[in-house]
Design a protein with these regions (language model features):
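Acidic/glycine-enriched connector segments
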Residues: 1-142
Length: 142
């Protein structure tokens, strides 16, 4: 099972959300999740990567992949098993992150979300996941 994440960039690692994220990812692993696609941009992405990295110590067979929106940027991939660049060569740079997000959602079986308002990139990604009829686990419904 493949899992991806979407959430607000201004997330700062609030304890209640982090606890929920650990519990949610752990439960998904027990359900068979073994591949985690992560975006690497913003606060929620960083926290999701940290949680998956921590849980890899307990579940060594899980794999975390940093999905890159650009090829010309240097990134810190130390918390990931590897990186991947989806087929975005023809996408204008200003759309690369949203198109990368769409790609991750299409590839995933489950989307774990921290979306608390209905504007911005995280809200657009969540709306896309709903249109694609993905299983969505959202911290806070609005």
């Amino acid at each position: 099972m493949t899992v991806t994440f979407c959430g607000h960039g201004d997330f700062h690692g609030e304890k209640a959300v982090m606890d929920w994220l650990r519990e949610t990812v752990g439960a998904l692993i027990l359900r068979g999740a073994d591949e985690f696609l992560l975006g690497g941009y913003g606060g929620f992405d960083a926290c999701a990567a940290t949680v998956v990295w921590e849980l890899k110590k307990k579940y060594p067979t899980i794999r975390s992949t940093l999905v890159l929106p650009y090829l010309d940027r240097t990134v810190d991939a130390t918390k990931y098993a590897g990186t991947l660049y989806p087929p975005l060569e023809q996408v204008p740079m200003r759309y690369a992150i949203s198109k990368r997000n769409d790609w991750m959602i299409r590839e995933a079986d489950v989307v774990v979300a921290y979306v608390t308002h209905d504007w911005g990139g995280a809200a657009k990604a969540l709306a896309y996941a709903k249109r694609k009829k993905k299983e969505i686990i959202n911290y806070e419904k609005f």
